[in-house]
């Protein structure tokens, strides 16, 4: 109350407050950005996928999700939201999580322009996700404690976490199982150009366990594999799997 009296005495009336807010709103509305480059902002153009393979991937995601009620889908490493949009046709809400803020900003802007509130772009370093914060870590829940997805997309993701992030395949599969929900996951073979580029920066033999047969064995130990689709290139495989109860 003392503060209100002081503001009133200084001539800071309700009309002045409204005018100040209007001026700030006008200033913020004028703010814009100059698109710059980031590691992944042109991934759809620079990746090694052919148009046919992109269509195969979109069709596989749609098939895995269609006809099954999904309240929430996590698209992990979702980049520009290409497959989040596919998932949104079969789900109430999709969280597109990625570690490239420029890519996510572009997605946010396009969604806002469309009036699309079904997809949420969320910045997240998957190798170091947001923990629980505040008093005893309970005031703001950790990212993966904020919702249990009915389905998870992990497309063109694991090779980055395994090779660049040095996370063992067994840990990655356990992590995906712990998140819960149906899984659509892509394994990129070490002979694939994108994986080979990452391995070129590592000592020979450092990621000897990063092989498709090892991944499939680990996946089948924690999930029931419903469907799989190998790309024409032979270096990438998609899997639709459900967690074992």
For every predicted segment, state its role.
Residues 80-92:
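Conserved SAM-binding loop of SAM-dependent methyltransferases across substrates and taxa
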Residues 106-146:
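S-adenosyl-L-methionine
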Residues 52-71:
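Conserved alpha-helix/loop element of class I SAM-dependent methyltransferases that forms part
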Residues 153:
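A conserved beta-strand element that flanks and buttresses the S-adenosyl-L-methionine
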Residues 93-98:
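Conserved SAM-binding motif I beta-strand of class I
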Residues 136, 160-176:
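A short, conserved alpha-helix within the catalytic core of class I
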């Amino acid at each position: 109350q003392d503060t209100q009296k002081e503001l009133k005495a200084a001539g800071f009336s309700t009309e002045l407050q409204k005018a100040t807010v209007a001026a700030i709103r006008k200033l913020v509305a004028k703010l814009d950005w100059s698109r710059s480059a980031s590691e992944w902002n042109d991934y759809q153009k620079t990746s090694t996928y052919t148009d046919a393979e992109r269509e195969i991937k979109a069709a596989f995601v749609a098939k895995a999700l269609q006809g099954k009620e999904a309240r929430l889908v996590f698209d992990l490493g979702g980049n520009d939201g290409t497959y989040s949009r596919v998932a949104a046709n079969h789900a109430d809400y999709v969280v597109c999580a990625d570690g490239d803020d420029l890519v996510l900003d572009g997605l946010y802007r396009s969604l806002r322009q469309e009036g699309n509130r079904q997809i949420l772009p969320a910045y997240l370093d998957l190798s170091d996700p947001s923990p629980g914060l505040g008093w005893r870590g309970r005031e703001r829940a950790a990212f993966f404690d904020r919702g249990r997805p009915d389905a998870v997309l992990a497309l063109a993701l694991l090779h980055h976490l395994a090779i660049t992030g040095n996370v063992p395949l067994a840990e990655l599969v356990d992590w995906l199982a712990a998140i819960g929900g149906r899984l659509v996951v892509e394994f990129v073979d070490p002979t694939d150009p994108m994986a080979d580029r990452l391995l070129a920066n590592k000592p020979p033999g450092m990621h000897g366990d990063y092989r498709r047969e090892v991944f499939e064995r680990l996946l089948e130990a924690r999930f029931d594999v419903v469907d799989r689709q190998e790309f024409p290139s032979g270096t990438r495989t998609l899997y639709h799997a459900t967690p074992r109860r």
